[in-house]
């Protein structure tokens, strides 16, 4: 699949942005497919990234029971299934929507 630098060069990697919608706006412009890879460029100890199960956990960025949580960076997530992948940490969040077959 294609490798996506999350946020693209314009956001400078996975870090807090002045606009909390920055990553959601970036994600809305992408056309993700299964086997695509999300590359989160951040430094270990400065950030983390989580994929959560439900939209409610996403909106609250509740990472107590994540699908996966990566405290060390940089990191990559492969989009293995169609559907909505809810990604968040702190005020950084977006949904990676992967169309079905």
UniProtKB/Swiss-Prot annotation:
SUPFAM superfamilies, per the entry: Cupredoxins
GO MF term list: electron transfer activity
PROSITE patterns: PHYTOCYANIN (PS51485)
Glycosylation sites: 41, 84
Record PTM text: The identity of the saccharide is not reported. The sugar attached to Ser-84 is represented simply as Hex. Cys-97 sulfhydryl group is modified but does not form an interchain disulfide bond.
UniProt KW keywords: Allergen, Disulfide bond, Glycoprotein
Domain Phytocyanin: 2-101
Keyword set includes Nucleotide-binding: no
Cysteine pairs bridged by disulfides in the record: 61-88
Positions of post-translational Blocked carboxyl end (Arg) modification: 101
Modified residues annotated as Cysteine derivative in this record: 97
GO cellular component, one term: plasma membrane
One Pfam family hit: Cu_bind_like
Top-level taxon: Eukaryota
Name of the protein this chain belongs to: Pollen allergen Amb a 3
Species assigned in the record: Ambrosia artemisiifolia var. elatior
């Amino acid at each position: 699949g294609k490798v996506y630098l999350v946020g693209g060069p314009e956001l400078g990697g996975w870090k807090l942005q002045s606009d909390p919608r920055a990553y959601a706006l970036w994600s809305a412009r992408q056309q993700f497919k299964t086997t695509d890879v999300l590359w989160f460029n951040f430094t270990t100890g400065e950030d983390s990234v989580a994929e959560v199960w439900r939209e409610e956990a996403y909106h609250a960025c509740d990472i107590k029971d994540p699908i996966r949580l990566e405290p060390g960076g940089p990191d990559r997530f492969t989009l293995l299934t169609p559907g909505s992948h809810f990604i968040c940490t702190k005020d950084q969040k977006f949904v990676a929507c992967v169309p079905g077959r």
